[in-house]
A protein has these predicted regions:
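C-terminal and inter-domain tail/linker signature
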Residues: 1-130
């Protein structure tokens, strides 16, 4: 099996393993050394416990895997000063993982934060469409 296929399978396994469960540091460290990403996972799991990730598309080249996916979770914890709304939200994101020696060592993420804020009621729906 070529390395790109292995990297894609690694990311599929990682996202499947973390989806819908409590995300512990030990679980994250099984897949990565990227401390920034570990922190983001812990932060979002505190705000949206047991959030789920649904993969829409994966592309691999060399040691990079790009994922277009959907986040789904219920807002039950503080999110940057936004108290829990108990609303279930879904938004799209794209993340690029850099893999080395069977671990994620770096990432780049872009997410539809406007949609997230609109769904939480922080930004009025009309403002989000402009």
């Amino acid at each position: 099996m070529d390395q790109q296929r292995k990297n894609k399978e690694f990311i599929i396994n990682y996202l499947t393993d973390i989806s819908g469960i409590v995300k512990t540091r030990a679980l994250a460290e099984k897949y990565m050394t990227d401390e920034v990403l570990i922190g983001q996972i812990e932060y979002f799991d505190a705000a949206f416990p047991r959030y789920e990730v649904y993969i829409n598309e994966l592309i691999a080249e060399g040691n990079l895997v790009v994922v277009r996916a959907r986040f789904k979770g219920t807002h039950k914890g503080d999110l940057g000063g936004i108290p829990p709304t108990h609303k279930t939200v879904e938004y799209n994101f794209v993340i690029r993982y850099e893999i080395e020696n069977g671990k994620i060592i770096n990432h780049w993420l872009i997410a539809d934060q406007m949609s997230l804020m609109e769904q939480l009621g922080v930004v009025p729906a009309a403002a989000a469409s402009h």
